[in-house]
């Protein structure tokens, strides 16, 4: 959802705009959310962005939610005037209240510790997790979902996106062998960059319109990339499994295979990096329009492109089979295609990722 309140880039046209104030009112940052006028403003701001799509259009489709920067009512930005993350107390209130009202927490899982950050909170049932979840399909497949904003730190070389206990859980599950397939699904995509501040990578958009690390990215933390490399190493080290990471965020449909991650040579066991596609993006919301560059492999990664990033509405279907993961990619062009075509769309690309061994 989009209702940025303080971010220099987005707030003027989103949550701090005159139109937003007319539609929903203004938040009081020193007040609670529930039981105050803040709750009214929240419902007016969030409800129309969530309910018609996920409560109506997807009413017969199970949907699981990961929060990212805008779900905390800010864009990830860092300047000398403001650094929007880690989330402030009020940002946390809004994000938690939105989840409480509109979409579910993750159910308990026997393999996920109940004491991870933002799990078993005092105002939630024991074992419910707000930011780190598991989708489990018997012994066939497990998908690990994790929010990189809730616990991020600004500690230089030791900074993290994901609390170290959460990282320990992710790596333990990746090393375990009790499911045929295991997929990582973080809220910020490994393998791809648009030069934003709150990404895994240090790349920025250079004057030539390309990503570069020759210019510093202010307030970016080296520890974020170190954690990324630890997670990618754990995926690459899996035996008899397809190393696959799926994310959204960058408003594109894409697939590539990581052949190098920093100093880690992955040519013998590439990691498939998928951008699953956006189901809805406003005309000015595509990265190439907003930032001057679309989803692009960062300099830290050598990526063999199989599906070059496409900035259109779409989605990805993954079929988990005992011996493979089969991916089908779908796209729909708002500018040239009628909505009736969505019901009969065929994949524009499909790929089979066989298990190792």
Where do the protein language model's features map onto the residues?
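Metal-dependent phosphoester/phosphodiester hydrolase catalytic core
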Residues: 1-357
């Amino acid at each position: 959802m989009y209702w940025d309140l303080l971010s220099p880039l987005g707030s003027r046209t989103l949550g701090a705009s005159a139109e937003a104030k007319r539609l929903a009112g203004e938040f009081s940052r020193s007040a609670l959310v529930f039981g105050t006028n803040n709750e009214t403003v929240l419902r007016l701001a969030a409800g129309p962005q969530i309910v018609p799509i996920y409560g109506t259009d997807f009413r017969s489709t199970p949907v699981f939610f990961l929060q990212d920067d805008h779900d905390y009512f800010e864009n990830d930005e860092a300047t000398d005037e403001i650094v929007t993350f880690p989330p402030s107390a009020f940002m946390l209130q809004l994000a938690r209240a939105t989840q409480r009202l509109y979409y579910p927490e993750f159910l308990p899982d026997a393999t996920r510790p109940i004491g991870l950050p933002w799990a078993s909170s005092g105002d939630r049932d024991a074992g419910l997790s707000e930011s780190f979840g598991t989708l489990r399909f018997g012994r066939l497949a497990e998908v690990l979902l994790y929010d990189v904003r809730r616990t991020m730190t600004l500690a230089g070389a030791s900074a993290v996106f994901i609390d170290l206990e959460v990282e320990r859980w992710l790596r333990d599950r990746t090393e375990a062998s009790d499911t045929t397939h295991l997929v990582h699904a973080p809220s910020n995509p490994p393998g791809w960059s648009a030069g934003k501040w709150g990404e895994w990578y240090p790349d920025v958009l250079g004057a030539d319109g390309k990503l570069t690390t020759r210019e510093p990215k202010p307030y970016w933390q080296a520890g974020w990339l170190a954690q990324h490399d630890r997670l990618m190493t754990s995926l690459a080290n899996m035996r008899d499994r397809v190393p696959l990471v799926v994310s959204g965020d960058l408003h594109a449909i894409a697939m590539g295979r990581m052949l190098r991650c920093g100093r880690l040579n992955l040519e013998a066991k590439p990691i498939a990096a998928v951008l699953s596609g956006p189901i809805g993006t406003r005309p000015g919301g595509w990265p190439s329009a907003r930032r001057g560059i679309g989803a692009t492999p960062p300099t830290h990664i050598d990526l063999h492109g199989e599906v070059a990033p496409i900035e259109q509405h779409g989605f990805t279907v993954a079929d988990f089979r005992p011996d493979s993961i089969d991916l089908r990619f779908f796209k729909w062009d708002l500018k040239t295609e009628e909505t009736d075509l969505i019901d009969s769309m065929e994949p524009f690309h499909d790929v089979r990722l066989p298990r190792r061994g």
